[in-house]
């Protein structure tokens, strides 16, 4: 028998696969497991074409090898190099499943996949069992859109979900990639939120999301635009900006919630990347970090209300809220190569769990407008270098429960720890003491003896302690117990307690200065001798017994 041609091989594999699927071949193991086929969307004409139309598919990009059927859940779909009339792939059923989805080289506005009328009155799902990949083609444009397109309806609506195992944008090239020197654009837009017929939309990635990494040395844009009600990345969002380019995720629906398992910068060469609301649209969105226990992710980039603008924003109502819900650690250092200019933080940062660190000292003073809510987790100021003092600025803050971190014990020993600054009012809500956690990044407790810090005697008067170190500043206080021990100095140990410290005790005080507000300071003393501890316990027992007798 002569050698089978590629076209004949594809046809043969399809026949075998369909025979196995539909019972034409009953004996298990008669044929080996077949690799998935690559299907190219090559419709006969422009406009909107249904997924189920066999003639819209080929086994090669040129369309010279027509497919025998539409793709199945084992097959990879390619939608590439469309620069002429707009082509739209309509999902022709409420549930569509494929292996991978690859797009590349499409001009702006020329390529999209849409949910159509089959989605109406359904919870429609487009499931990709592998990855969605936005590759860099040979030209300057790599654009693609996911959307909805519906014919006349009578009050019908739909909920839509796109779900994939992974997502990559601007990580690899296609067909040799771009070989020139001009600015290239790789933009993937999920636009369901713009359709009123779609009442709820979700974009879910069960693994990691990767932006950038192709290695282009000149100007380039890599953008994921999310206009959905809810986005979820169960893995980690990994971003880098290639060459002198920029990479970003733009939240583009008001009220959008974006849950992610961590945010990580993957290259330090040139940093111009971030997550923010689409500029000048007046949007509010929320990032919810779900970092798993034991993880510690670092990101240096522009996490702000509307990203970078070189001129004042036309709409100043944008807010990016951040919630830390995971048991792990997330660190964000607000940064952009060159200048942050009008980048602003005005949302609410809520720390419910785990550890969350923020450094935003590079923002202009007038753009530090965020609020902090400490509600069970641990928060700390942060500098990406980790050898220099970091600053976390907030307009207001509320401490309910949880703790603040003094993680860099070397900086603390030098009395220059990273500093939390509240430019207006810091409030205490509730009776629970706020922990001041000295545990370092490796989970090791702080031992002052390792840094040759002299300790005051246990029970020493605050005026006798000479190792006071400032860890927080607030212009005004509300709800704290201010027991004055001398002029302008208040005992703060009723509201704060040390943790993650050994062979020493931490005591706290507020120092009030008319010009600078209130400074929270930590002093270190020796631990009490065992006999002193016993005496303290005995005194407490006697006091309790006396109180009970008086109550009878």
Predicted segments — roles?
Residues 1-5:
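Short, Lys/Arg-enriched N-terminal segments with co-localized hydrophobic residues
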Residues 529-547:
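A short, hydrophobic C-terminal helix/tail in secreted or cell-surface proteins
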Residues 549-552:
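Short, charged juxtamembrane terminal tails flanking transmembrane helices
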Residues 284-298, 319-322, 346-351, 358-469:
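Extracellular beta-strand/loop-rich repeat segments of large surface/secreted proteins
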Residues 7-34, 537, 541:
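Gram-negative bacterial Sec-dependent N-terminal signal peptides
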Residues 34-127, 131, 137, 458-526:
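Solvent-exposed adhesion/ligand-recognition segments of exported proteins
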Residues 43-45, 49, 136-233, 273-368, ...:
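Extracellular repeat-rich scaffold modules on cell surfaces
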Residues 38, 76, 88, 95, ...:
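Detector for repetitive beta-architecture
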């Amino acid at each position: 028998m002569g050698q089978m041609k590629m076209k004949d091989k594809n046809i043969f594999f399809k026949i075998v696969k369909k025979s196995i699927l539909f019972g034409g071949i009953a004996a298990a193991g008669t044929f080996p497991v077949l690799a998935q086929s690559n299907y190219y969307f090559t419709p006969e004409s422009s406009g909107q074409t249904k997924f189920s139309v066999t003639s819209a598919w080929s086994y090669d990009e040129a369309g010279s090898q027509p497919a025998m059927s539409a793709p199945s859940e084992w097959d990879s779909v390619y939608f590439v190099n469309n620069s002429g009339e707009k082509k739209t792939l309509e999902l022709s059923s409420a549930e569509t499943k494929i292996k991978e989805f690859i797009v590349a080289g499409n001009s702006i506005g020329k390529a999209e996949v849409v949910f159509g009328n089959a989605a109406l009155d359904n919870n429609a799902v487009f499931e990709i069992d592998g990855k969605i990949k936005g590759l860099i083609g040979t030209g300057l444009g790599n654009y693609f859109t996911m959307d909805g397109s519906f014919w006349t309806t009578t009050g019908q609506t739909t909920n839509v979900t796109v779900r994939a195992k992974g997502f990559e944008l601007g990580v690899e090239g296609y067909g040799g990639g771009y070989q020139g020197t001009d600015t290239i654009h790789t933009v993937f837009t999920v636009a369901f939120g713009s359709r009123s017929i779609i009442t709820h939309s979700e974009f879910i990635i069960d693994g990691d999301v990767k932006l950038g990494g192709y290695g282009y040395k000149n100007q380039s844009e890599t953008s994921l635009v999310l206009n959905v009600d809810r986005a979820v990345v169960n893995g980690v969002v990994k971003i880098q900006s290639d060459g002198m380019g920029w990479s970003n995720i733009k939240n583009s629906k008001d009220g959008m919630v974006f849950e992610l398992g961590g945010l990580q910068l993957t290259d330090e060469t040139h940093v111009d990347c971030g997550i923010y609301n689409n500029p000048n649209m007046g949007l509010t969105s929320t990032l919810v970090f779900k970092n798993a226990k034991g993880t510690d992710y670092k990101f240096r980039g522009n996490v702000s209300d509307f990203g970078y603008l070189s001129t004042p924003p036309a709409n100043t109502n944008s807010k990016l809220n951040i919630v830390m819900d995971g048991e792990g650690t997330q660190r964000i250092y607000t940064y952009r190569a060159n200048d942050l200019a009008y980048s602003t933080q005005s949302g609410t940062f809520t720390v419910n769990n785990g550890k969350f660190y923020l450094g935003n000292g590079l923002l202009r003073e007038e753009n530090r407008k965020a609020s902090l809510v400490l509600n069970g987790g641990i928060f700390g100021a942060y500098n990406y270098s980790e050898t220099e003092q970091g600053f976390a600025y907030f307009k207001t803050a509320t401490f309910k429960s949880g703790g603040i971190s003094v993680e860099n014990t070397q900086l603390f020993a030098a009395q220059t720890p990273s500093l939390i600054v509240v430019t207006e009012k810091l409030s205490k809500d509730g009776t629970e003491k706020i922990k001041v956690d000295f545990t370092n990044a490796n989970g090791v407790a702080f031992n002052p003896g390792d840094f040759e810090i002299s300790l005051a005697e246990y029970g020493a008067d605050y005026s006798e302690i000479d190792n006071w170190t400032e860890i927080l500043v607030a212009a005004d206080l509300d709800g704290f117990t201010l027991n004055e021990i001398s002029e302008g100095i208040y005992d703060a140990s009723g509201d704060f307690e040390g943790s993650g410290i050994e062979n020493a005790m931490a005591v706290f005080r507020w120092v009030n200065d008319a010009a600078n507000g209130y400074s929270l300071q930590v002093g270190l003393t020796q631990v009490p001798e065992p006999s002193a501890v016993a005496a303290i316990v005995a005194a407490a027992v006697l006091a309790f017994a006396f109180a009970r007798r008086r109550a009878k």
